[in-house]
Amino acid sequence: MSRDLQLGLFPTEPVADLMPDLVPDEVDIYILNLSGGKDGPRAAAVALDAARAVGVEDRVYTIHASLGPLEWPAVTVDGVRYPGSSELAALHSRALGVPPERHIEVRRTHELQGERVPYDLLTYIAERGDWPWKGVLPCRSDWKTGLIYGAFSAMVRARKKELGRPVVCANVLGIRADESPDRKKRPALRTTTDNTFRVVHEWSPAHQVTTQEVKDWTDEQGLPHQWCYDSHPGAGDWKGSSRCSCSLCVLANRRDLLLAVRRRPRLAELYALVERVRGVPFNPNTSMAELIERAARPGAPDPGVVTEDEGPEFDALENAVQAALKKPAKRARYVRPVPGADALPGSCDGCASAGPDQEA
């Protein structure tokens, strides 16, 4: 793929129409969010074109907020290795032409026995005694948005001192209208933070691009996509998972969950352990125990590949979760709304999106 990725495949709105209050050369820092999924690169490419058009490409950074072993891992099939989400985010950044030194990966940590170690979301859930759900999504705020803001705090402080004014940031997301009703209503451009340190404009330049257009664009550009999207690694048929978020996301649709349970049985069993010990179902519509049982029935999605989930990183997660479950839950469960529909909403609305009003 060429370093300067050209977007001539689809007619899109002119950049000026997409961002009437955002002047490309007045943005001090472009933050391009890459999850390893299909939508981030499509949005990032538009933002990169805008920055390049006015000669400020050096202000562009890509960032990936890693969820560790809860993300889709790398797999090797028939001697071919297919990268996991974190690795793929870095590959996407390079393919788009962003220098490696301007790609940032962040992951939440905490102190354990005098050293900083990864602090995974499932450990937090086990400690807390309940699962994320709409309106209470630590997977979005504490494991993504907060870390992303924090990663740029030192840069913002330095730039503010240099400029003598708040630093203008464009937080570029791959949110698209056809992912969910909530995302359809979400504006393509909005200001999420405005204080003495920074002004953050959340920009979703691929908001009106359809799912099929994203897939076609990805294939046409020769951009590698996450293997979880396919019926089996290397198929290139987009007949696997519909979304690439956490492997087992509480907001995923039922087919995606059944497919993930079959592809990552060891992770599913760990989720089921948390569910069983804390006595709280995975989400209001279904339990992980039920999903595991349904995934074993005839007619369940063919996994195409089954990951072993072996290695020190997963073992550390398992040990941390088991240790957390030996202690009382840190807070009482709250009452979650129970939707009547059998299928779950098909999107994790706002992953790494609504930035907290944090100062640098």
Segments from the language model and where they lie:
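Nucleotide-activated chemistry modules centered on ATP-dependent adenylation/adenylyltransferase
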Residues: 2-360
